Amino acid sequence: MLRVVSWNINGIRRPLQGVANQEPSNCAAVAVGRILDELDADIVCLQETKVTRDALTEPLAIVEGYNSYFSFSRNRSGYSGVATFCKDNATPVAAEEGLSGLFATQNGDVGCYGNMDEFTQEELRALDSEGRALLTQHKIRTWEGKEKTLTLINVYCPHADPGRPERLVFKMRFYRLLQIRAEALLAAGSHVIILGDLNTAHRPIDHWDAVNLECFEEDPGRKWMDSLLSNLGCQSASHVGPFIDSYRCFQPKQEGAFTCWSAVTGARHLNYGSRLDYVLGDRTLVIDTFQASFLLPEVMGSDHCPVGAVLSVSSVPAKQCPPLCTRFLPEFAGTQLKILRFLVPLEQSPVLEQSTLQHNNQTRVQTCQNKAQVRSTRPQPSQVGSSRGQKNLKSYFQPSPSCPQASPDIELPSLPLMSALMTPKTPEEKAVAKVVKGQAKTSEAKDEKELRTSFWKSVLAGPLRTPLCGGHREPCVMRTVKKPGPNLGRRFYMCARPRGPPTDPSSRCNFFLWSRPS
């Protein structure tokens, strides 16, 4: 039996939960080994690894008992990426990165590209530069003893962001390139399995809220899947596509069979998601060899769950891994570079040495002159303020004065006329001035006391009380608006329960309240 599993892992370096929840958070490499063992598959295809080649470490890339193959995003770090881990008893005979062949090395590649004349070289490079496809080709033996070729296409198809129409075009062009390559492999005599995150819920049964989605059947991605797949799985139908959705072949009417849930809304708790992950096999392969196709929703650690299939064939491992295998990368191959490669003789002409010496002498003289000027203009210690008293706590909460303070070196002219007018002369004037001065001090002390009281009340008051939602009378959660617009950055309260249909009383109610600025 050959068992294949696909999983959008949502970051291979993140501290995974679920399968690897017993590992410390800084041992992601050990967690990957545990995940592969727990999935118990001969071939494991991972999507959205979110790792670039320079960030790939040896413990992540080389796992005992497996040979691995990675495709990286060449434009962005921490984005996209796919990886395939094969047990040593399922070592492929060939491996290749990308669908177009532009990244092929002509040594150990899969080949069979089909007619790609409708694409420009720039378009092909853009489609393959995000690290979304990885091909491994294996030798398999059927129960009749016949040896055949099986090609696995591990894909992470693009997401069509509604706010970026160009990404829908990119997604559909990627679909087209994937179909051309898969059909070319079929025409060359190889069996083909397309598995991974296709980022499209094919039919209404594959989406929890399909009835409320406008023009669900008219979506370009769903129309593409209609042309690729045979209707009604293994049964006869009006349209016979080259591939079969293996899960719907075995479970044609299973509802609630989802593989992806929104982590923001907590929709996984109530199983309100969509089926975006598939194992698609060519018709002959699925009908003759597929024994089961399954989902693993109990496996946590990502916003997706693993999917897989079991084939009644045995793998014929290659004697040597293809060159794309990560153990052959220079950084992991264990070959030591000679130190002479880092030492380059530096030759200079006499004229260059003489000009450099003159430049250095001039620089030294100029530096000495600058140091002398700095010493002559440096202020004496007595001129610098030496006040180091402890600051009042309120000074950190008061706005700094906008007008600059006067320099201590500037002497203001004395005003004898004003001082003569303001100085009390008679005993009555002195008494009045004394009373006024006392009242001013009392008022100032009172204002300062009130200011301190209001300040400490605001500090010690604590956060505002969390409101209760109207539907369940439960404490709400605070969210922040991240959509560009006039309310960007504003905070609001909403029901803390997971998202679901309005008819479900255990799902989120429609409570909404803007948060008051503190």
UniProtKB/Swiss-Prot annotation:
pH dependence of activity: Optimum pH is 6.0-8.0.
- Tell me what reaction this enzyme catalyses: Exonucleolytic cleavage in the 3'- to 5'-direction to yield nucleoside 5'-phosphates
PTM summary: Ubiquitinated by the CUL9-RBX1 complex. Ubiquitinated by MKRN3 at Lys-371 leading to proteasomal degradation.
Q: Does the keyword ATP-binding apply?
A: no
Effect on the protein of changing H269A: Abolishes AP endodeoxyribonuclease, 3'-5' exonuclease activity and 3'-phosphodiesterase activities
Q: Which cofactor does it need?
A: Mg(2+); Mn(2+)
Q: Where in the cell is it found?
A: Nucleus; Cytoplasm; Mitochondrion
The entry's stated outcome for F397A is: Reduces 3'-5' exonuclease activity in presence of PCNA. Does not abolish the 3'-5' exonuclease activity. Does only partially redistributes together with PCNA in nuclear foci in presence of oxidative-induced DNA damaging agents
User: Which tissues does it occur in?
Assistant: Highly expressed in brain and kidney. Weakly expressed in the fetal brain.
Q: Which GO terms describe its biological process?
A: base-excision repair; DNA recombination
Bias (Polar residues) ranges: 355-405
Top-level division of the source organism's lineage: Eukaryota
Record flagged with keyword Zinc: yes
Q: What is its EC number?
A: 3.1.11.2
Enumerate the residue ranges forming zinc fingers (GRF-type): 469-518
User: Where on this chain does Mg(2+) 2 bind?
Assistant: D197, N199, H304
The feature of type site (Transition state stabilizer) is located at: N199
Q: Where's the Glycyl lysine isopeptide (Lys-Gly) (interchain with G-Cter in ubiquitin) crosslink?
A: K371
One GO cellular component from the entry?
Answer: intracellular membrane-bounded organelle
Regulation of its activity:
3'-5' exonuclease activity is activated by sodium and manganese. 3'-5' exonuclease and 3'-phosphodiesterase activities are stimulated in presence of PCNA.
Q: Which cysteines are joined by disulfide bonds?
A: none
Q: Which family does it belong to?
A: Belongs to the DNA repair enzymes AP/ExoA family.
Protein name per Swiss-Prot or TrEMBL: DNA-(apurinic or apyrimidinic site) endonuclease 2
Please state the gene responsible for encoding this protein: APEX2
